[in-house]
Structures are given as C-alpha cells and as structure tokens.
From Swiss-Prot:
Belongs to the MnmG family. It comes from Bacillus subtilis (strain 168). Keywords: Cytoplasm, FAD, Flavoprotein, NAD, tRNA processing. One of its GO terms (biological process) is tRNA wobble uridine modification. FAD binds at residues 14-19, 126, 181, 370. GO terms for molecular function: flavin adenine dinucleotide binding. Its main location: cytoplasm. Transmembrane segments: none annotated. NAD-binding protein involved in the addition of a carboxymethylaminomethyl (cmnm) group at the wobble position (U34) of certain tRNAs, forming tRNA-cmnm(5)s(2)U34. One of its GO terms (cellular component) is cytosol. This is tRNA uridine 5-carboxymethylaminomethyl modification enzyme MnmG. It is found in: Cytoplasm.
Length: 628
C-alpha cells in the first residue's frame, strides 16, 4: 500500500555531485524541487580523491560557475590547497586543481541546499519510477511514498546494484559502505533500459602522524591567490601541503606475488574499470619496466588524521595492502585507517539519451553523472547542472538548452556520451575537444555567462559586472591597437633587455605583444593605460591578442560546423528507407537518432559516404518517408 506524499515540478534522485547541481539549477530557475537521497549525511560526499579540478576537469568547474552552478564557489570556500597546472604551457591546457577539505565541502554544500528556498531535501530510497503513457510522472520510495513531478532527474552515482570487492570478500554496498540501490536498477531493466557494469576503485587511507614526511617531497600550493568562481573575492591563504613519494621494487614484488589474490585477475570483478585511473596492480602489470610509480599523500581535511594515498588504488586483500604500504618510503610504519577497495555498479548505455540528457525511451526522465558512464566529480557536476537546467525548463514549459562542442567542455562531454557512447568509465581529457583553444580556463565566463543569465541562474548584478569586464577588454584591445610604440633609444634599450630585436619603425602595441618575448605587462611599460587595468582583463587582452590568428582559425572551423549543426534531421526519419547507406551506419543511426547532420557525422561507423547520401535525401526534402 502506498500513499500520495507530494507534488513537485522536479524530483532529483541522489545528492552527489551531479544531484546537488541538478537540484540547485532546477530550484533557482523557479521550479519547485525535491531531492531524495539514501543518506542526508552523504550530500556531496567525496568517496574517492579529496580534490576538485585538474586538466579539462578544472575548466568544467569554471564552466559550471559561469552558468551559475555551485561547485566552484563551494571548493573556493573549503579547499586546503590550490595550484594552477601546466603554467609552462599554452592557455588552452592550463587548469586549476584544488585539494578539498572533504568534510567541510560536504557540510557547506548541504547547507547551501538547505537554505535554497525552492528546494526540499529528504532522506529516502527510491525504488520505482511512476511511468504513465511513456512519461515519467514521479517516484515511489521504499516506504510507499508516491511523489509526483513534471520531470525527474536520476543521479544515482555508483549506488545502482553497487558491490564492494576487497580481496576475496564481496558484498552488496554503495560507496564507503553505504546502502546500495538494488530495486531501482532492476526497475530500469524492467522499463527496457540497456545497462552496463562498470567498476572503479579507491586507495587506502593512512594516519598522518604515522607518516615519516622527511622521506617524502613537499608539494605546496600556489602563493598566488587562485579561485574557481568568478564571484570569489576572499581567498584562503592558510594552505596545507601534499607530499610526494614513490613505490619501490619491493612494492612491485609484493603485488606480483599476490596477483592470484587480486579480484581483478581472479575474474571476481566483471565490471570495466577506468582507463585513465588504473589500479596499482594494473600499473605494475602493464608497465613492468618501470621501477617505481608516483604516490601523492593528500590530507582529507584540516581536522582529520586521514591521508589519501593517491596512486595506490587497489582491491587486493587487507594484509597485502598493509605490506605494500610498508615498502613505500615514508610509510614504513604507517597505520592504515581504511583499506582500499573496488566497487562495481550499473550504468545506462548513454546513447539512450538525447543531448538534453532526457532519456529517449521515457520522456521527462533525465539522467546525469556516473549513471551515464562517466567517472569524476567534475564530469558528474557538469552533467548535473545541464540535466537540472533542462528538467526545470521542461517542467516550466520553457525551451531546453544544449551546449555545443564549441561552447564548452560540458558540451564535448555530453556529445561524446550521447553520440558515441562509452564502453568504459568516461573521463574528460583536453584531447577530446577539437576546439580547445576556444575552451580555456580563462574565458569560461565569456562563453557561458550570457546563457546563465538568460535562464535565470546568473543575477543581474553579476551580469552587469560581466558586461563591464567585457567592455574593458574591448576598450584595452582597441587602445593597444591604436597606440604606436616608437623606436626611441629608451624603448629600444628596454626591448633589447628582454632579448628582443630592435624596432625598425613605430609599431602598434598589439603587434608588439605578438612577439614571443613580449606580453601585456612588458608592452604596457612602453604604453601604459591611463587607469590600471584589472588582472583578469589584462590576461584576457594578452591571450586574445597573442593567439589572434589561431583563435580566428578555430572560429572559422566552428562556423563550418554550425552549418552542419543547422541541418536538422527529423526525429522519426526512417533510415531503412534510405538506399545506399552501409548496414553498420544504418544500425548506428537508428540507435543514436542524431538531431543534426553534424552529430550524425560524429557517430563511429558512419562514414562520409553515408553522410553524403543522407544529405541528398534531406536536401531533396524527401526525408526518406518518415516512418509513422
């Protein structure tokens, strides 16, 4: 027997990194939102690494912030260390990474959800969806509560039929020994969704005061104040270091001699693990020529002794983990507080989704995060904000939002998932983005703040500050383009001191800045502005001027892509009626059901000849006799 428990615009299942962004995005747009989670003490919990950001991922956090999301603001308030990565490389691959106080991060994010006026936070286990006439109309919990909604977002993480594996021990569990979600997974199969089995792992945690830090290398944070959020004005200066050590030949020997006890090699683990975050067993076997592997010791917070042993992800038995740790410099006498483990879980095949993250099978049902086959908090949060935006907008009768591959890394991530699918936990990399010079850490606001403001997630006050910054960038570029730097003796001497060749004639400030030895700071010593320019404006001017040619080339490629994106494919096109398309391409097109010719061209197995035939049919207006 069930009972009617309430009516909402949007219900979010799960309150991990995808769930909190989905819920806040929905509620802040004006949709009455309910969040149901198995354990209220686990809101925004970090079951694996206590960090946010890194290559590509850090840019996603900036994009979430530019859209009006919460992850950037939250980590700025709760980090213990922050570093800019790849500073010696070009701006396209620079990214911020923060070590989190994982407990403070959780507390702060839960507090944010509790204070959100349009949002209700509730502990409960969802076991079934209410589906009527192919539409999701709500959820049913373990206690029989029926919650009705116009849209539902599933952000179930690694809880779906979760199973923890540690040596020869295996038991049903969510991450960190939380209760798993069994019946919801079975229900998804009943509804006809294709599920896959993935696996991830985590390393042991050790006690800080049993580490001999004198045998490790200190890894401090940056001295320069850093922030993910464009709104952050107060910076944490009291940072904690991380520490670097290495495995030893003895470590590898212990692993090799115990591979028969590893669930990965005994066949006990059936799920596919992440390629770019392998276990230590995998690293030792696959890279057996390497005498050692890096191990980073990362504090899990300011008020805990627990230290995360980054690089030692494992599911080997506890006794083997203890022996492994004792062979690592600095950890000879370490106390293991928690053993590492592997966790298997169900995910849906993501080609069953539209680019809005709504499922094709059931309307008004959205999915985001690890349920879609991704790995990583940032990838989850990026999907979460988009699913929350679109579920909220659909519930309110508004047009949904799709970010393209040239708009954001979030657009690349979602397009890869829904177009190509994934046969392993998907991790976002800079190499996955063909327009990465346009998708930089520094310009996320210029790319996405207008969208965030239009949909109601960016305040008018913040938008006015953004418009002021944009105007300042253009004004300074215009000034530097018009100013002529003359070949005076003083100027020539200064340029020579920087290792540059002398000026033959007067040169525009923008042209001088394009020289490799020059930057905004050096050029403005020769042609200073009347009023000092803010650092973020100066950085943007320098990048836009220095890389103008490359940026222009990328923008031309984007324009070509937009023409293909604008060639829409009707949803109910009958690919079987199009003669000449290869069998594999026909099957893939029917499965993915791309919305545009550009998306169709990105499907693996669909070649240019197939696209040409498809274009002919579309241009003739025949549309291959759309199937009824």
């Amino acid at each position: 027997m069930g009972y009617e428990a309430g009516q909402y615009d949007v219900i979010v299942i799960g309150a991990g990194h995808a769930g909190v962004e989905a819920a806040l995005a929905s509620a802040r747009q004006g949709a009455k939102t309910l969040v149901l989670t198995i354990n209220l003490d686990m809101v925004a919990f970090m079951p694996c690494n206590p960090s946010v950001g890194g290559p590509a991922k850090g840019i996603v956090v900036r994009e979430i912030d530019a859209l009006g999301g919460e992850m950037g603001r939250n980590i700025d308030k709760t980090h213990i260390q922050m570093r800019m990565l790849n500073t010696g490389k070009g701006p396209a691959v620079r990214a911020l990474r923060a070590q989190a106080d994982k407990f403070q991060y959780q507390h702060e994010m839960k507090n944010t959800l509790e204070k959100e006026p349009n949002l209700t936070l509730l502990q409960g286990i969802v076991e079934r969806l209410i589906v009527e006439d192919g539409e999701c109309r709500g959820v049913i919990t373990q206690t029989g509560a029926h919650y009705r909604a116009k849209a539902v977002v599933m952000t179930t993480g690694t809880y779906l039929r979760g199973r923890i594996i540690l040596g020869d021990l295996s038991y049903s569990s969510g991450p960190n020994n939380q209760q798993p979600s069994i019946k919801l997974s079975e229900h998804l199969e009943e509804l006809g969704f294709d599920l896959v089995r993935f696996k991830t792992g985590t390393p042991p945690r050790v006690k800080s005061d049993t580490i001999d830090y004198s045998k490790t290398e200190i890894q401090p944070g940056d001295d320069v104040p850093r922030a993910f959020s464009y709104e952050t004005v107060e910076y944490i200066t009291d940072q904690l270091p991380c520490w670097l050590t290495y495995t030893s030949p003895e470590t590898h020997e212990i692993i090799d001699s115990n591979l028969h006890r590893s669930p990965m090699y005994s066949g006990m683990i059936k799920g596919t693990g992440p390629r770019y975050c392998p276990s230590i067993e995998d690293k030792v076997v696959r890279f057996n020529d390497k005498p050692r592997h890096q191990i980073f010791l990362e504090p899990e917070g300011r008020n805990t002794q627990e230290v995360y042993v980054q690089g030692l992800s494992t599911s080997l038995p506890e006794d083997v983990q203890q022996r492994m740790l004792a062979t690592i410099p600095g950890l000879e006498n370490v106390q293991m507080m928690r053993a590492g483990y592997a966790i298997e879980y169900d995910a849906i095949v993501p080609t069953q989704l539209w680019p809005t993250l709504e499922t094709k099978k059931i309307t008004n049902l959205y999915t985001a995060g690890q349920i879609n086959g991704t790995s990583g908090y940032e990838e989850a949060a990026g999907q979460g904000i988009m699913a929350g935006i679109n579920a909220g907008r659909k519930a309110l009768g508004k047009e949904e939002v799709i970010l393209s591959r040239s708009d954001a890394y979030i657009g690349v991530l979602i397009d890869d998932l829904v177009t190509k699918g994934t046969n392993e936990p998907y991790r976002l990399l800079t190499s996955r983005a063909e327009y990465r010079l346009l998708l930089r850490h520094d310009n996320a606001d210029l790319r996405l703040t207008e969208i965030g403001h239009r949909i109601g997630l960016i305040s008018d006050e913040r938008y006015a500050a953004f418009e002021k910054k944009k105007a300042a960038i253009e004004a300074e570029k215009k000034r530097l383009h018009s100013v002529i730097i003359k070949p005076s003796p003083e100027n020539q001497e200064y340029i020579r001191s920087l290792g540059g060749s002398e000026l033959k004639d007067g040169v525009r400030g923008t042209d001088l800045m394009k020289r490799p030895e020059m930057n905004y700071e050096t050029v403005t010593k020769l042609a200073p502005p009347e009023v000092p320019v803010p650092q973020d404006v100066a950085e943007q001017v320098e990048i836009q001027v220095k890389y103008e040619g490359y940026i222009e080339k990328s923008l031309q490629q984007v324009e070509k892509l937009k023409k293909m994106e604008n060639k829409k494919i009707p949803d109910r096109i009958d690919y079987d009626a199009i003669k000449g398309i290869a069998t594999e391409a026909r099957q893939k097109l029917k499965n993915v059901r791309p919305l545009s010719v550009a998306q169709a061209s990105r499907i693996s197995g669909v070649n240019p000849a197939d696209i040409s035939i498809l274009l002919v049919y579309l241009e003739q207006g025949r549309i291959a006799k759309i199937a009824e």
